[in-house]
Amino acid sequence: MPDHDLPPPALPWVLITGGTAGLLGLYLLAVRTVSGQRLDNAVLWRLEADTALAERLLPLLTLAGPVVMIVLCALVCLAGLRRGWRTALGAGAGAVVCLVTPQVLKLALPRPQLADPWPLPNSLPSGHAAAVAALVCALLVVVPRSARGAVLILGSAAVGVMGLLLITLGHHRLSDIAASACVGMIGWGTGLLVQASGHGETVTASAAS
């Protein structure tokens, strides 16, 4: 891969640190406080669709669900092989982080009943929104630097639309969607780290020869 296509060395760590801090902050503020749960529930109840509209919107959730996103991520990783195996591996690593992290956190993090009307399991982060973020992360690793801005803007919009759909259907709260965006940051940073791994050794070996 050309040097000019590699990210700045600090960018992966900025993304991973920022995403982790955002994820922790959202959990502590939105899930572990009374005011956070009240705000989350108020937004959910305000935006939640009626039954008739929800039935019409539900098929969209399947069309852009995790299974479809996993297939698209695999295709992006295969396309990444044209730019080198580390690029393909980085795209896959970023996607896996986005796909696995929500499932682990939803099981590991408890949701205390502070302002909820009844005991509820933790739903932070959203797996569906994180699956869309997984595809965005894979693309951000694979595409040339000149296209990353457009992919980032369109991808962020796609995650936002999926998030709005999930809230409208009553499946997730606003904090769940924001947490998925943080997971996306961590996934992107991880993908960039894997992509850039070994590049310094390659450059050194080439110079020595």
Language-model regions: role of each:
Residues 116-209:
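Membrane-embedded catalytic cores of phosphoryl/pyrophosphoryl-handling enzymes
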